[in-house]
Design a protein with these regions (language model features):
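Short acidic/polar active-site loop segments enriched in Thr and Asp
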Residues: 101, 184, 210
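A charged, well-structured terminal subsegment
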Residues: 239-252
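Active-site acidic carboxylates
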Residues: 2-155
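Internal catalytic-core helix/loop-beta-alpha segment
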Residues: 137-185
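Short gly/pro/ser/thr-enriched loop/turn and capping motifs at secondary-structure boundaries
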Residues: 194-195, 218-222, 247-248
């Protein structure tokens, strides 16, 4: 292939695949452990070891090329350097070995021109991506589950995309799947913790389920947004634990 053909080859990424500046990477925390709150007193009354031994679902949300690869629409948030992908891989591997977890890889696309839309949705979705002018190939690449998680995906795992604003409880068959499999324990990882994770955790509680959030396997758009979100989730909706604690519990 000549140099000219390389230069004119269509780009597969929605944005230019440019690495983040070293100056920005240098200020990103390698992990968000410091943002994780102490477990709320009421959750301390639970036997999490027993709860995590029940039929359970491991649910990763939004962990795509968009977030972790140069050229992705959300790559500029720096998640590739903030440790949540590594914590997800470690947690998912332990859950797989435990043998009692179903796996669901939930996609969250920012490109929503074909989604059913209210007037609110229309203007909000347009603000995310309309100026990018991405091709379908670029959109498909952006939405693809990141390679590190594809490597631990297995036949029988469920993959789906959210079609509501920020919840898979509306517009997908996952709630029905969980009900039919008698699964009530849900373990969440992914982005964004103050958006899809918190929204689905709240919905899970309202639907009689038992959500648990692996905090360092999640991330907000900006690191400084995480502590308040984790504190709110932990106080009101679900235990927020570290990947180290999760791995320890499911390996016992």
């Amino acid at each position: 292939m000549t140099q000219t053909s390389v230069l004119t080859q269509p780009r597969t990424t929605p944005l230019e695949p440019t690495e983040l500046p070293e100056s920005f990477r240098a200020i990103l925390p390698a992990t968000n452990h410091a943002a994780l709150p102490p477990m709320a007193d009421h959750w301390k009354q639970l036997d999490l070891l027993e709860i995590l031994s029940r039929p359970a679902a491991f649910i990763s949300i939004g962990q795509s090329n968009s977030v972790y690869r140069p050229g992705g629409v959300q790559y500029g948030e720096g998640h590739a350097f903030r440790g949540n992908l590594e914590a997800t891989v470690r947690s998912a591997t332990a859950a797989r070995a435990a043998g009692n977890f179903d796996f669901t890889w939930v996609g969250y696309s920012l490109f929503r021109s074909q989604y059913p839309q209210t007037d609110f949705d229309r203007v909000q979705y347009a603000s995310w991506t309309d100026e990018i002018g991405a091709t379908q190939e670029q959109i498909d690449w952006d939405n693809t589950l990141v390679e590190e998680l594809q490597a631990i995906r297995e036949p029988g795992d469920k993959e789906l995309f959210e079609t509501a604003l920020q919840s898979w409880f509306v517009g997908t068959d996952l709630p029905g799947t969980l009900a039919r499999k008698r699964i009530e324990v849900l373990v969440f990882t992914g982005v964004h913790v103050d958006w899809c994770i918190e929204g689905n955790v709240r919905a899970a509680r309202d639907n009689g389920l038992l959500p648990i959030v692996i905090g360092d396997a999640c991330g907000a758009q900006r690191p400084e947004q995480e502590a308040a979100t984790f504190d709110r989730i932990n106080r009101f909706f679900a235990p927020v634990i570290s990947s180290d604690l999760f791995v320890d519990l499911v390996r016992r």
